[in-house]
Structure formats: structure tokens, C-alpha cells
């Protein structure tokens, strides 16, 4: 067994990233291996582990583990409204997500700690002629913890296939903001780029720290099978944003009161809210 294989076996999130998509019905047609380099090979099995802990005057990035092409360097404190908040930028050394990539991320916010995690720029899923790319994200937010996970938009290139699975484990007193923004593609790059990807599959689940399920949502987009411009789907819009807020009820009610539902097709703005705790 190689050193990489041993590390993968010893890291549950990496095991899941390599298995994700193998039995997914939406990816059944895309199980062929890339000719250039097999899926999940060295340089194509990325991993990030970030653990945040509370100290006297601020929270810190207490532990970090990284495997190419995933990279994090250090936490910065640039949020003037929350000066104790460590802000971490995730970087891809390959520049984009490629066919055969298997990516995993573990973020752990300890009791009373806080963290903001984002990306250096939009995440581009490169066009593919074999296989697919997969991603596992696992977040743990302990008692009184606060996590903002707000990456820049994801841009799927034409003929790309991407599957992502996210699990948020959270204490009832903690708060987590999770965001994913999906673009229609490189709209002005090529005539076939707008909704030219093959598959985008996303599953997000939340549970308490004992493993009790809070919610699960999954959507699979296959624009070559069914148009995404239909009413009730994208309806001519080019960006889809999904923001999930998990927070105690006293915060939840005040936030909902300030975020009304809104629809403006001329202005290109549609905002829906789900009033659930």
C-alpha cells in the first residue's frame, strides 16, 4: 500500500470522496477512467482539515492538514466587525477542478470558537471527456460555536460532471451559515457554455452532534436531459444561490423578519426564503 493510499484509508472523508459517485445513478454513464491519469491519483486526491479553537482574545486556526491540490496557508483577521474571527482562504494549486478529482474537506469549530472559510476566487469545474469530479464536505460546530462557510461561485464548464455531498453537525446553541452559488457556466465564452454541463449533483444534510437528522436536501441538474430555463427552475436566470442558516430560534426569527421573499424578473433577482428552524 502506498503512503497516499494509507492516508486515504485512515481519513473517513477521503474514503467517502473516492466512493462518492461510484453508485450514483446520475453518474452511471461516466465511470470510465481518464486517459491522462487515473481518478484519485497523487495530485488528484485533495484534502483539507481545519480545526478552530477559542483562545483568550480571539479564535485561532489550531490545526491544519492539507493535501494537493487543496491548500490553505494561514488565518487572517480582516473582519472589522468581528476582529476575533479567523478568516481562512481555500486555494486550489491546480487552478480548477478536473476530471477524476476526489476532494474532501473537514472543518471543526470547537466550543465557543468562530471561523470564516471562503475561496480565493470562483471554483471552475473544467470540461471533461471521461469520469467526473467528486467532493465531500464535513463541518462540525460545537456548543456556542460560529461558522461562516461562504465560497465564491462555482462555474461548471461544458461537458463537466460534478457531485458534492455536505454534512453539517451542529450543537443547538451554535450557528452555521453555509452557502453555495452555482453559475450557468461561462456564458460569454462559447455558445454551448450556458448550462452546457452534463451533471451537477448536490446533497446537503444537517444533524445534531448525536447524529439526529435535522434535514436533508438533494438536487440533480442535467440540463442536456431537461431544460433548466423552465418556470420554477432557473427561468432565464444565470445564477443559483443556496444559503442555509442554522441558528437558535431567537436569532432565526429576527433574521427572517429582515429578509423578505422577492421576485424581479426584469431586474434579474429572485429570492426565496424557507421559514424553518
Swiss-Prot record:
Q: Which Pfam families match?
A: UreD
- Gene source species: Yersinia pestis
- The record's disulfide annotation reads none
InterPro entries in the record: UreD
Cite the record's note on assembly: UreD, UreF and UreG form a complex that acts as a GTP-hydrolysis-dependent molecular chaperone, activating the urease apoprotein by helping to assemble the nickel containing metallocenter of UreC. The UreE protein probably delivers the nickel.
Q: Which domain of life is it from?
A: Bacteria
Q: Identify the keywords attached in UniProt to this record, alphabetized.
A: Chaperone, Cytoplasm, Nickel insertion
Whichever gene encodes this chain, its name is ureD
Hey, which family's this protein in?
A: Belongs to the UreD family.
**Gene Ontology molecular function terms on file:** nickel cation binding
The upper taxonomy is: Bacteria, Pseudomonadati, Pseudomonadota, Gammaproteobacteria, Enterobacterales
The record, for HAMAP family, names: UreD
Cellular location(s): Cytoplasm
The record's Gene Ontology cellular component field reads: cytoplasm
Name by which UniProt lists this protein: Putative urease accessory protein UreD
UniProt KW Cytoplasm keyword: yes
Q: Which PANTHER family match?
A: UREASE ACCESSORY PROTEIN D
Report the main location listed first in the record. cytoplasm
Free-text function comment from the UniProt entry: Required for maturation of urease via the functional incorporation of the urease nickel metallocenter.
Amino acid at each position: 500500500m502506498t503512503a497516499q493510499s494509507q492516508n486515504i484509508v485512515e481519513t473517513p472523508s477521503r474514503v467517502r470522496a473516492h466512493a462518492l459517485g461510484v453508485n450514483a445513478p446520475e453518474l452511471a454513464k461516466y465511470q470510465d477512467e481518464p486517459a491522462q491519469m487515473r481518478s484519485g491519483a497523487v495530485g488528484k486526491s485533495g484534502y483539507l482539515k481545519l480545526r478552530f479553537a477559542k483562545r483568550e482574545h480571539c479564535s485561532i486556526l489550531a490545526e491544519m492538514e492539507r493535501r494537493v491540490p487543496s491548500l490553505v496557508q494561514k488565518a487572517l483577521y480582516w473582519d472589522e466587525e468581528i476582529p476575533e474571527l479567523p478568516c481562512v482562504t481555500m486555494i486550489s494549486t491546480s487552478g480548477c477542478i478536473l476530471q477524476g478529482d476526489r476532494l474532501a474537506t473537514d472543518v471543526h469549530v470547537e466550543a465557543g470558537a468562530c471561523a470564516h472559510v471562503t475561496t480565493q476566487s470562483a471554483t471552475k469545474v473544467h470540461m471533461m471527456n471521461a469520469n467526473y469530479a467528486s467532493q465531500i464536505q464535513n463541518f462540525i460546530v460545537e456548543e456556542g460555536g460560529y461558522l461562516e462557510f461562504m465560497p465564491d461561485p462555482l462555474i461548471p464548464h461544458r461537458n463537466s460532471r460534478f457531485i458534492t455531498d455536505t454534512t453539517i453537525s451542529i450543537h443547538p446553541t451554535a450557528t452555521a451559515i453555509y452557502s453555495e452559488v452555482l453559475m450557468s457556466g461561462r456564458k460569454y465564452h462559447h455558445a454551448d457554455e450556458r448550462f452546457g454541463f452534463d451533471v451537477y449533483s448536490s446533497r446537503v444534510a444537517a444533524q445534531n452532534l448525536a447524529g439526529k437528522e435535522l434535514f436533508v436536501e438533494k438536487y440533480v441538474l442535467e440540463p442536456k436531459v431537461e431544460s433548466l430555463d423552465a418556470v420554477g427552475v432557473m427561468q432565464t436566470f444565470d445564477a443559483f444561490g443556496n444559503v442555509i442558516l442554522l441558528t437558535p430560534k431567537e436569532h432565526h426569527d429576527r433574521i427572517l423578519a429582515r429578509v423578505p421573499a422577492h421576485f424581479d424578473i426584469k431586474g434579474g433577482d429572485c429570492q426565496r426564503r424557507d421559514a424553518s428552524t
